[in-house]
Amino acid sequence: MADQIPLYPVRSAAAAAANRKRAAYYSAAGPRPGADRHSRYQLEDESAHLDEMPLMMSEEGFENEESDYHTLPRARIMQRKRGLEWFVCDGWKFLCTSCCGWLINICRRKKELKARTVWLGCPEKCEEKHPRNSIKNQKYNVFTFIPGVLYEQFKFFLNLYFLVISCSQFVPALKIGYLYTYWAPLGFVLAVTMTREAIDEFRRFQRDKEVNSQLYSKLTVRGKVQVKSSDIQVGDLIIVEKNQRIPSDMVFLRTSEKAGSCFIRTDQLDGETDWKLKVAVSCTQQLPALGDLFSISAYVYAQKPQMDIHSFEGTFTREDSDPPIHESLSIENTLWASTIVASGTVIGVVIYTGKETRSVMNTSNPKNKVGLLDLELNRLTKALFLALVALSIVMVTLQGFVGPWYRNLFRFLLLFSYIIPISLRVNLDMGKAVYGWMMMKDENIPGTVVRTSTIPEELGRLVYLLTDKTGTLTQNEMIFKRLHLGTVSYGADTMDEIQSHVRDSYSQMQSQAGGNNTGSTPLRKAQSSAPKVRKSVSSRIHEAVKAIVLCHNVTPVYESRAGVTEETEFAEADQDFSDENRTYQASSPDEVALVQWTESVGLTLVSRDLTSMQLKTPSGQVLSFCILQLFPFTSESKRMGVIVRDESTAEITFYMKGADVAMSPIVQYNDWLEEECGNMAREGLRTLVVAKKALTEEQYQDFESRYTQAKLSMHDRSLKVAAVVESLEREMELLCLTGVEDQLQADVRPTLEMLRNAGIKIWMLTGDKLETATCIAKSSHLVSRTQDIHIFRQVTSRGEAHLELNAFRRKHDCALVISGDSLEVCLKYYEHEFVELACQCPAVVCCRCSPTQKARIVTLLQQHTGRRTCAIGDGGNDVSMIQAADCGIGIEGKEGKQASLAADFSITQFRHIGRLLMVHGRNSYKRSAALGQFVMHRGLIISTMQAVFSSVFYFASVPLYQGFLMVGYATIYTMFPVFSLVLDQDVKPEMAMLYPELYKDLTKGRSLSFKTFLIWVLISIYQGGILMYGALVLFESEFVHVVAISFTALILTELLMVALTVRTWHWLMVVAEFLSLGCYVSSLAFLNEYFGIGRVSFGAFLDVAFITTVTFLWKVSAITVVSCLPLYVLKYLRRKLSPPSYCKLAS
């Protein structure tokens, strides 16, 4: 019978004719007959012949201008590009990756996931082998740790290059110095990396061991036994106590709660902080004792494992009853792993374990984000490698290719290898850690958490900011503001009138019920005693408030009084309902706001379980209602409903509420709903339409029969259930329209203004309706009051999108507002053109956006503009957008921590993003740019000195400095001053916040570009040449004097260059300068005996008598001054003649 339920609603002939007429207008071809597609609220699109519509759009009925660049044949250009050029650049990578992936898939041979039959308490009856219920987050094991870490390091070309260079020192013919000269820096980098990986791996092992070793009670024929979480199998009956983690995916069989339901916390699974109500299988809940689970013959048929945590299809069957009992299972009957039991004790049968659980299947490794600064440094490093090879070839060429020239070439590669600094990555990683620490310690943005420490510089390069609305720009704290009944509207200042109407209605009902028990219902009697006008308004208010307080998924929770117990008690009908200790639990803040409002006007929800609700009237009377059916809210239906029976009158009523777009076709004809929805949305209110329908007992029984059959179907269950429910959703009586306000967060307006002045374009992506999104955009000053707004009209086909894009193209300097459906059509046919037009707008608002669309918009901006994007949100629907962006920011809000946990940076309020970007982002980028260039300068200058030295001595491949000189130069002699640049800042934080225009300069990338790189190369060549030639000219009698003079001048030059670059001194910078100088001076004395005199090494120039003379000091000073003074003069003149922006502000 269930399979006979129609899957799709029948389309009217008029609708089909209108659709054909529309298609005929937009193309010369006739309408294409085809199968109907299930879409109740979307206009159908004849996609087949739309694909045939030419881009030139020259058919009759279209306007085509010469300036219309939408008509460019871009497809042909892209097709030509995918030729030999594509294969040489990227095609071979794609082909190799595809082949490797194919081979890996063949080797792994993943087991196909299938549906399963699980017998209660009988794991041995499982037909197939299921994975162990163990959690493993470790990347390596004991045997693969060292090979794995080494592979991760040496898969990068530069690290592999340093390994080859270091290994070459084992070849006698290529050896040019001590082994530790090359192996010490490489070993240090590897040691730091392996230590960090080992610590992280050990922490993962400890966490996995702790989770896998948790003990649970397993129910067996002989009683309860303790079992580890990792030993749980499919079919086991597991008992989970309150506040205990659920170890695997289970079907909920029994609970200690009388209501047959329990609450669970899912914040670790979906990030939502609201408790979820779960319902036990009625057949097993009704068993007298726990041990009776083994006295019945029952099984669960479960669908194959899948990722969707919000849906489940299955059946429960008891075979030993007559007739057999069949119950449908849905998401409300499941207990997913990694959730927490919040009330009572639950018993469930395990259906999925290990990697087949929903939590594990939804755990994916997010993409490894690489910052733009790292990519730029990689490009510069590749340029340095080319310079290294070119310089070595030049030296060999000038040498005349004498002897074994290839050996000399390799030796020159070794001598000049310091051009590519191996310490660059270590310095930058340590700098990123410092930036993250500064962000988290900033008292002006408390609660900030840095979860991805590799991309702090991205915060200083952003061009596009994509933000959610609810909970991000707004507080997600809902306040009931407006009730509209069609003819009268009640606002915040007239709520006392509603309260008076409700109180009068129930007092008259009570008096009439006590005075006369025959005739009409109490409500009708109450109405008949009132004047005609008053009766109509009072009746409508009463029905509206009653519908609001009955149609929801809210559960009142009563906390026991202090000093008794900490257990949470749930209200029962016969207990004393206290307003003091009652709180409401629901999956949406809107629901709670509505129920709290009904409480404020006198009608209070005091109790709710699976089958009943109790309401308390203003006089204290308790009204009972039986819940017959509940239809929860889904993102597809955009509405929820409930069927209840009034126990005092036995009347059955179907209540429903939802979004206006979903409810408009359902309710009876009216002339005010659409207009008032628009009015409320323009005020920034979130609207819900409330309706009802009275049912007879026969109508309900017929519906229940069809609904039960649909729920038992294992194929297309959701479609069949929707079809049955839709048969009930016809000609419903419109009761009221509610408006709930979500207030803006603190300082949203100045923050958005600051971001706009910083050159950041802001796009708001929200799932809310167009009017509400537009109103919030105006009230938050996302769109200034002087700017025009172009509302992209609804389009459903390629032709309509073409015409609307042409109309939009003629607009200038106006904000764009577009719905998700229109956006989908535009991206399908005119992706490049739409993005190009949208990027020219000062602001863009996308409403009715799905999470997938949000992520796609981020990806499109990255692909089409090449600029850095940032996404910020607070809910689970923002996670995909946050992970797709170059920089993701999560806000810990009312909707939980899922967005915060998935983001790269976590903040507590939207206004904190201003300081995060203007101060920390800007400083991080400028500091890393200076640090990277200084580290490269440090390698370039010593390589220049080596080149000069070799050229002077007949291009001999002999090292100028050896041993500890090279190691000390890259570490203790210069590392601290150079690294102290991470504390430098050009302007004070207050100045950066006051003048956000300073941020705009960073998007051009001038702090680290090929121009600045070439300037530093020229500086290095100049200084290296001066230091080396100066030492050669001024040395006296021995060669060791050349080494002593040049190396000492080199160290002083590096220290002075750091001092000349610093713009704001920090006391740690001063300490670093003097510490490095002190280390160098002290090493002259302590290492004198360690190196032999007479060798070209560190000890060779330790002629104490020479280095303590005035001659040595003035020669070193002269060379240092000549190498640094001209640069200082040029810098001074530049700041006077063409000062940068920060200098103008500082002055």
Curated annotation (Swiss-Prot):
InterPro entries: ATPase_P-typ_cyto_dom_N (IPR023299), ATPase_P-typ_P_site (IPR018303), ATPase_P-typ_TM_dom_sf (IPR023298), ATPase_P-typ_transduc_dom_A_sf (IPR008250), HAD-like_sf (IPR036412), HAD_sf (IPR023214), P-type_ATPase_IV (IPR006539), P-type_ATPase_N (IPR032631). It catalyses: ATP + H2O + phospholipidSide 1 = ADP + phosphate + phospholipidSide 2. GO terms for biological process: endocytosis; phospholipid translocation; retrograde vesicle-mediated transport, Golgi to endoplasmic reticulum. Residues 1-146, 197-380, 432-930, 983-1012, 1062-1067, 1131-1147 are cytoplasmic. The chain crosses the membrane at residues 147-168, 174-196, 381-401, 410-431, 931-951, 964-982, 1013-1031, 1039-1061, 1068-1088, 1106-1130. Residues 505-530 have a biased composition (Polar residues). PROSITE patterns: ATPASE_E1_E2. CDD domains: P-type_ATPase_APLT_Neo1-like (cd07541). It is an enzyme of class 7 (translocase). Its cofactor is Mg(2+). Keywords: ATP-binding, Golgi apparatus, Lipid transport, Magnesium, Membrane, Metal-binding, Nucleotide-binding, Translocase, Transmembrane, Transmembrane helix, Transport. Belongs to the cation transport ATPase (P-type) (TC 3.A.3) family. Type IV subfamily. PANTHER family: PHOSPHOLIPID-TRANSPORTING ATPASE IIB-RELATED, PROBABLE PHOSPHOLIPID-TRANSPORTING ATPASE. This is Probable phospholipid-transporting ATPase IIB.
